[in-house]
Amino acid sequence: MSSLDNDKTENFIQERLDSLHEIDCKVVTLLDQFSSIFQSFYTKSKEDFSQQTSDIYSTLSKVAIDLRKEIKIMDDNIGAYDKNDDNVMILPISNVDQKNTKLGRKRLDLELAELKRLISDEKQVETLENESNNEIQPKTESDTNQVETNENGNDINNKESEDIEMKE
């Protein structure tokens, strides 16, 4: 391979590296913007907050577009050497789509167990709150209008009904 071919290869690769470096810098800027918006949320005016939010969305959009472009360039150059000026071919890798599913499944199971525990704790708290609300209820106007009765259906507060029961 001649030095001219080596320079061409380095050009394509260097362009990809430079492009990824720019994307990385934009991601760092995005993180910095997030940090500043959280720090200044309570202290600055609404105009500043909306401007910072707009800047975040703008940077995020630029990062997404640049990443899509790089992915397209990589996809176009897989298995084809004539897609770029430097005749660089990216070899296909068949194992790229495989993920560590065991670790992901274990993490998912742990998260689901934690959620179930939290939900059951919430339900217990709700039932305790409902029970405590049922035990102590302030009298309402409708409660004061109700007449208390004994097992015979007679008014407890009415003395005449007691006298009738005693005579029987």
Curated annotation (Swiss-Prot):
UniProt biased composition (Basic and acidic residues): 157-168
Chief site of localization: nucleus
Pfam family, one: Med11
Disordered: annotated span: 126-168
Keyword annotations: Activator, Nucleus, Transcription, Transcription regulation
GO CC, alphabetical: mediator complex
Polar residues bias: start-end ranges: 130-156
BP terms from Gene Ontology: regulation of transcription by RNA polymerase II
Name of the protein described by the UniProt record: Mediator of RNA polymerase II transcription subunit 11
Subcellular localization: Nucleus
Similarity remark: Belongs to the Mediator complex subunit 11 family.
Assembly: Component of the Mediator complex.
Keyword match Transcription: yes
InterPro entries per record: Mediator_Med11
Function: Component of the Mediator complex, a coactivator involved in the regulated transcription of nearly all RNA polymerase II-dependent genes. Mediator functions as a bridge to convey information from gene-specific regulatory proteins to the basal RNA polymerase II transcription machinery. Mediator is recruited to promoters by direct interactions with regulatory proteins and serves as a scaffold for the assembly of a functional pre-initiation complex with RNA polymerase II and the general transcription factors.
Single GO term (MF): transcription coregulator activity
